[in-house]
Amino acid sequence: MNASALAENRSESAGRLRGLARRCRELAEMTMVPDVTRELLSIAAALDSEAERDSRR
């Protein structure tokens, strides 16, 4: 795999992770269970962090 294909693949991966994080935040807004809300927001933060790491490589 060449360098540009690798960079594109990382960008797509980071985008998917950010999309999942966004969906977790949306679900957190919909739920009325505080523990579930906290867990979804924690997952969203972890996904955002991973996306940021992917985009920097």
Segments (PLM) and residue ranges:
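Long, non-catalytic architectural segments outside compact domain cores
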Residues: 1-57
